[in-house]
Amino acid sequence: MDKIKIALQYMMPKHLISRLVGKLAAAELGSITTAAIKWFIKQYKIDMSEAAQSEPEAYTTFNNFFTRALKPGIRPLFDDKDYIVHPVDGAISQCGPIKGDQIFQAKGHEYSSLALLGNQADDAKRFEDGDFATIYLAPKDYHRIHMPIKGTLSKMTYVPGDLFSVNPLTAENVPGLFARNERVVALFETEIGPMAMVLVGATIVASIETVWAGTVTPPAGKKVFTWDYPTEGPDVITLDKGDEMGRFKLGSTVVMLFAKDALDEFAKDVVPKAVTRMGQPFAKIED
């Protein structure tokens, strides 16, 4: 059965399906939208008591519901300068050292940081022998992405690609999954060195947004687009620890990369399959 599911993903028109779902998710359809939201809440057992707007009728589009804000204080920030925090609600897919430029995906599967970062060689070199973490956001999760540490944006890269599902089954069976799906790479300069936040698209993920650029929608095609940002002066973009940096419309995966010797150790509960909550301790940083 698993092989059939994977084979179907190779065959299905993933981009077309994602575009159609995206249009529906952005449409204001009144009672139809409300009914869809209620079904989704029941199907995925979503705890709406955490949402700033808990009533399904409060959302005019499915996208508004999916990117819903949480009540203030519902995700307290672990306020210890020696720790960086989880950027999202989700589950750890994998985490650990980057071996040279190789990142562990699942048993029998690795991929390179060079491929993940859109073949930006200078960027990839900064993360050789560093550390990584891959966090999967399930449909039930809160889908805004926050900063694990204060950082100044230096570069954004849009990498076109496929739109495979990014659930655990696909991660175990599709080689180089996170380096072949469509993605947005945000490179930050931090007190512990460079940090990459890679927002990976997936089937029916209508779009990826950042707080500085809005929805990232370059022209269709195979071209990689890059944007450089000043790290000094009046136009600098600096986000504090815990600030929102982006969001998914219909969920996916975040891959974080850190430079060699930036992290001392992961928090004790940061292990594969562990549930994450935004703002909780993720890793201790080097002194």
From Swiss-Prot:
<comment type="similarity">
    <text>Belongs to the phosphatidylserine decarboxylase family. PSD-B subfamily. Prokaryotic type I sub-subfamily.</text>
</comment>
<keyword id="KW-0670">Pyruvate</keyword>
<feature type="modified residue" description="Pyruvic acid (Ser); by autocatalysis">
    <location>
        <position position="252"/>
    </location>
</feature>
<keyword id="KW-0444">Lipid biosynthesis</keyword>
<protein>
    <recommendedName>
        <fullName>Phosphatidylserine decarboxylase proenzyme</fullName>
        <ecNumber>4.1.1.65</ecNumber>
    </recommendedName>
</protein>
<feature type="active site" description="Charge relay system; for autoendoproteolytic cleavage activity">
    <location>
        <position position="146"/>
    </location>
</feature>
<dbReference type="GO" id="GO:0005886">
    <property type="term" value="C:plasma membrane"/>
</dbReference>
<feature type="active site" description="Charge relay system; for autoendoproteolytic cleavage activity">
    <location>
        <position position="252"/>
    </location>
</feature>
<dbReference type="InterPro" id="IPR033177">
    <property type="entry name" value="PSD-B"/>
</dbReference>
<keyword id="KW-0210">Decarboxylase</keyword>
<feature type="active site" description="Schiff-base intermediate with substrate; via pyruvic acid; for decarboxylase activity">
    <location>
        <position position="252"/>
    </location>
</feature>
<comment type="subunit">
    <text>Heterodimer of a large membrane-associated beta subunit and a small pyruvoyl-containing alpha subunit.</text>
</comment>
<keyword id="KW-0594">Phospholipid biosynthesis</keyword>
<comment type="function">
    <text>Catalyzes the formation of phosphatidylethanolamine (PtdEtn) from phosphatidylserine (PtdSer).</text>
</comment>
<dbReference type="GO" id="GO:0004609">
    <property type="term" value="F:phosphatidylserine decarboxylase activity"/>
</dbReference>
<dbReference type="InterPro" id="IPR003817">
    <property type="entry name" value="PS_Dcarbxylase"/>
</dbReference>
<feature type="site" description="Cleavage (non-hydrolytic); by autocatalysis">
    <location>
        <begin position="251"/>
        <end position="252"/>
    </location>
</feature>
<keyword id="KW-1208">Phospholipid metabolism</keyword>
<keyword id="KW-0865">Zymogen</keyword>
<dbReference type="InterPro" id="IPR033178">
    <property type="entry name" value="PSD_type1_pro"/>
</dbReference>
<feature type="active site" description="Charge relay system; for autoendoproteolytic cleavage activity">
    <location>
        <position position="89"/>
    </location>
</feature>
<dbReference type="GO" id="GO:0006646">
    <property type="term" value="P:phosphatidylethanolamine biosynthetic process"/>
</dbReference>
<keyword id="KW-0456">Lyase</keyword>
<keyword id="KW-0472">Membrane</keyword>
<dbReference type="Pfam" id="PF02666">
    <property type="entry name" value="PS_Dcarbxylase"/>
</dbReference>
<comment type="pathway">
    <text>Phospholipid metabolism; phosphatidylethanolamine biosynthesis; phosphatidylethanolamine from CDP-diacylglycerol: step 2/2.</text>
</comment>
<keyword id="KW-1003">Cell membrane</keyword>
<keyword id="KW-0443">Lipid metabolism</keyword>
